[in-house]
Amino acid sequence: MDNPLRWFEIPTTDLDRATAFYEAALATALRRESCGGNPMAIFPYTCPHPGGALVAMPQLAPRDNGTLIYLDGGDDLNAVLARIPAAGGSVVMAKTDLGKGIGHIGLFIDSEGNRVGVYSQN
């Protein structure tokens, strides 16, 4: 197994609001689709690399204490974290150096109440 992550889903209660949040916070466009009758907003990715989506499924609920994923924070993690409040979320951990050249992370609560991380090598 070269990479254990293949796909992730971030639950939403309001897909339009969550899509607007992530598009603003990450400065990117998400692609809207439906899979099995469930609406989704898919993050940009290319096969065979891992991908993921925001999903609106009644059996899934946003959480701030469940599984934690880290999205790509690009070259300027501080810029991503600075956009979080205006997009409707809150930063719960500022840019933090992991040491030993591993990179940097930050944590936020999204517009739906999910705790999500961002990672950058810089």
Regions found by a protein language model. Give the residues of each.
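Amphipathic alpha-helical interface surfaces
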Residues: 18, 50, 80, 88-91, ...
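Short alpha-helix boundary/capping motifs
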Residues: 50-51, 112
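Conserved active-site tyrosine of GNAT-family acetyltransferases
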Residues: 18-22, 84, 113
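Vicinal oxygen chelate
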Residues: 3-13, 31-34, 42, 59-85, 104-109, ...
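Generic beta-structure capping elements
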Residues: 45-46, 57, 72, 121
